[in-house]
C-alpha cells in the first residue's frame, strides 16, 4: 500500500522503497508542470505544422512553378487579408503588374489577366476540351437554400436546362413585352428625384436611390409587387440584408478553404445571426405571395409560376432563382448607374455631349423607349465605358480547371481559376489611358484598344442571363433622367473608385446629386 507525505507542498508518494519513491516522485513532477510549458509545446506543434504546409505549398505543390506574392503562394493569408478589406481586386491587379498574366494568389488558386483567358476559362468547349465548371464559391453563394439555381448550379448539364427554362423571359423579345412594367417604375423614379433633389436641396444619395429603383423594378418583375422604396423614400430592409449577405459570403468563402475552420464557424455562429437565413426566409415569403397572384402577369417568373403549379419545378428552386435574380440584377445595375453618374459629373464635356444627343433623339418624354434609347451611339459608348472602368462584378467568376493549357502552361485539373476583370480593364496593354473615362474609344474605328478585353457579362454558355435586362434598364434610366434634368454632383471631390470596396459585389460610397430642370421645355413625369 502506498502512503503519501501530506506535509509536503506537493503530493509525494511514500512506499518505503527509496528507488520506487524516486521514480514515482519524478512522475508526479510532470503533473505539476506549469501551463507555460504545455503552451509552448502546443505552439511548437502548430508552428511545425504551418512550416510543413507552407514548405509544401512553396516547393512541392503542383502550382509551385507559378509566380505570385509570397503569402499567396504559401498560404491563404493573402486572400484573407485583402478580401476582408474589400480590396482584393486592387491587390490582384498589382500582383499581375508585377508577375504577369498568370498569378498564384492562393495555394490552389490562379488569377488570369489576358484576353485569351476569357475564352479559355469561360468560352464554349472546343476540340474535345471539357468546360470549366463553376468553383466551390457557388456552393457558398447558394447557402440558405435547399435547391440550386441558375446562379449556383455547378453541373454544366443541369445549368443548361435551367438556362433553357429561363431564357425566354430574358430574351430581347420577352423583355420588350415587359417594358411597360419596367418603365412605370423608372418614370416614378425620375419624378421623385425632381421633387426631392432640386435646386436648393442637399441633393440625394444616388448610391441608395439607384438601389431603391432597381429593387422596386425587380420586386415587380420577380415577386409581382414593388418593394415601395420610391414611395417611402427609405431603402427596403432586404437591400441592406443583401449587402450583409454578400459580406457573409465573402467570409464563408474564405473559411470553406479550411475545412475544419468552416465547421467550427458553423457551430459557433448561431443560425439566427447569419444573414443568409434572413435572405432565404424573406425570399420564401415573397414567393408564396407571388404564387398566390392568380391574375396573369407578364414578368420574369411567369413561366416559373406555371411550372411550380404544374409540379415541374419545386417552390424551393423557384425561390433560389428569384433571390439570385434580385441580388445580381439589383446590385449590379445600381452599381453601374452610380459609377456612370459620378464619371459623367466629373467629366462635364462627356455629360454635355450625352445630354444633347438624348434630347435631340426624343421630342417628348413619352417617346423614350428601350429600342430607341439603344440606338443612340454615344449612350451605348458611355455605358460600355462605365462597365469597363467600374466592372460590376470585379471579384470575377471562379471556375475549376478541367486540365487545360494557356500561355504554354498547363493548368492542373482541380485548380481554382478566375479571370480578374479589374486587372484586365485597367491594363494599358489593352486600353489607352485605362483610368480615364473616355466613351469615345468605343466609337473610334481607329482606336487600338482591345475591346474584347472588357467582358462585364462574361461569355460562353454561362454568360450573364440578365444582360438584356441590365442594358434595357441602364438605357431607360439614363435616357429619361438626362432628358428631364441637368445633373449637379454635390460632393465633387469624391474618389468613387478608391472609396468603393468589393465583397462579392461593390460596396459604394455616398454619391449626392441635385437634379435641375433644364432651361429648355422639359417634362416632369407623373
Curated annotation (Swiss-Prot):
Residues that hold heme according to the record: 464
Listed InterPro entries: Cyt_P450, Cyt_P450_E_grp-I, Cyt_P450_sf, Cytochrome_P450_monoxygenase
Transmembrane segments: 41-61
Domain of life where this protein originates: Eukaryota
Protein's name in the database: Cytochrome P450 monooxygenase BOT4
Species whose genome carries this gene: Botryotinia fuckeliana
KO phenotype (gene knockout): Abolishes the production of botrydial and accumulates 5-hydroxy-7-(oct-2-enoyl)botrylactone, 6-beta-hydroxy-7-deoxybo-trylactone, cinbotolide B, and cinbotolide C.
One GO CC annotation: membrane
Amino acid at each position: 500500500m502506498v502512503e503519501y507525505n501530506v506535509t509536503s507542498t506537493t503530493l509525494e508518494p511514500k512506499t518505503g522503497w527509496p528507488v520506487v519513491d524516486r521514480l514515482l516522485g519524478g512522475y508526479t513532477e510532470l503533473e505539476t508542470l506549469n501551463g507555460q510549458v504545455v503552451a509552448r509545446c502546443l505552439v511548437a506543434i502548430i508552428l511545425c505544422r504551418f512550416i510543413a504546409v507552407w514548405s509544401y505549398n512553396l516547393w512541392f505543390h503542383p502550382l509551385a512553378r507559378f509566380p505570385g506574392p509570397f503569402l499567396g503562394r504559401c498560404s491563404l493569408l493573402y486572400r484573407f487579408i485583402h478580401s476582408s478589406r474589400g480590396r482584393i481586386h486592387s491587390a490582384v491587379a498589382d500582383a499581375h503588374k508585377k508577375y504577369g498574366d498568370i498569378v498564384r494568389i492562393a495555394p490552389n488558386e490562379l488569377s488570369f489577366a489576358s484576353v485569351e483567358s476569357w475564352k479559355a476559362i469561360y468560352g464554349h468547349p472546343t476540340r474535345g476540351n471539357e468546360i470549366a465548371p463553376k468553383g466551390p464559391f457557388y456552393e457558398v453563394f447558394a447557402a440558405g437554400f435547399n435547391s440550386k439555381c441558375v446562379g449556383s448550379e455547378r453541373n454544366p448539364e443541369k445549368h443548361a436546362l435551367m438556362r433553357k427554362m429561363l431564357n425566354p423571359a430574358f430574351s430581347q423579345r420577352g423583355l420588350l413585352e415587359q417594358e411597360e412594367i419596367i418603365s412605370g417604375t423608372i418614370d416614378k423614379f425620375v419624378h421623385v428625384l425632381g421633387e426631392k433633389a432640386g435646386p436648393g436641396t442637399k441633393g440625394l444619395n444616388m448610391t441608395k436611390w439607384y438601389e431603391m429603383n432597381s429593387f422596386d423594378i425587380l420586386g415587380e418583375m420577380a415577386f409581382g409587387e414593388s418593394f415601395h422604396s420610391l414611395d417611402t423614400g427609405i431603402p427596403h430592409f432586404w437591400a441592406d440584408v443583401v449587402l450583409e449577405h454578400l459580406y457573409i459570403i465573402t467570409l464563408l468563402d474564405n473559411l470553406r478553404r479550411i475545412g475544419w475552420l468552416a465547421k467550427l464557424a458553423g457551430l459557433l455562429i448561431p443560425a439566427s445571426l447569419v444573414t443568409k437565413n434572413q435572405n432565404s426566409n424573406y425570399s420564401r415569403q415573397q414567393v408564396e405571395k407571388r404564387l398566390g397572384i392568380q391574375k396573369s402577369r407578364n414578368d420574369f417568373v411567369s413561366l416559373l409560376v406555371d411550372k411550380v403549379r404544374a409540379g415541374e419545378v419545386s417552390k424551393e428552386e423557384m425561390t433560389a432563382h428569384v433571390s439570385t435574380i434580385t441580388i445580381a440584377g439589383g446590385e449590379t445595375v445600381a452599381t453601374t448607374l452610380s459609377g456612370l453618374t459620378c464619371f459623367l459629373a466629373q467629366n462635364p464635356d462627356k455629360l454635355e455631349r450625352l445630354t444633347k444627343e438624348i434630347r435631340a433623339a426624343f421630342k417628348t418624354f413619352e417617346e423614350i423607349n428601350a429600342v430607341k434609347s439603344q440606338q443612340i451611339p454615344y449612350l451605348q459608348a458611355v455605358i460600355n465605358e462605365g462597365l469597363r472602368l467600374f466592372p460590376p462584378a470585379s471579384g470575377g467568376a471562379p471556375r475549376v480547371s478541367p486540365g487545360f493549357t494557356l500561355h504554354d502552361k498547363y493548368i492542373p485539373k482541380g485548380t481554382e481559376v478566375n479571370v480578374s476583370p479589374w486587372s484586365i480593364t485597367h491594363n494599358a496593354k489593352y486600353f489607352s489611358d485605362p483610368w480615364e473615362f473616355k466613351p469615345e474609344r468605343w466609337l473610334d474605328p481607329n482606336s487600338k484598344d482591345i475591346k474584347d478585353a472588357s467582358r462585364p457579362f462574361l461569355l460562353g454558355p454561362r454568360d450573364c442571363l440578365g444582360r438584356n435586362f441590365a442594358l434595357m434598364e441602364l438605357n431607360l434610366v439614363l435616357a429619361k433622367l438626362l432628358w428631364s434634368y441637368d445633373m449637379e454632383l454635390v460632393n465633387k471631390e469624391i474618389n468613387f473608385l478608391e472609396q468603393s470596396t468589393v465583397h462579392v459585389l461593390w460596396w459604394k460610397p455616398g454619391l449626392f446629386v441635385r437634379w435641375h430642370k433644364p432651361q429648355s421645355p422639359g417634362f416632369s413625369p407623373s
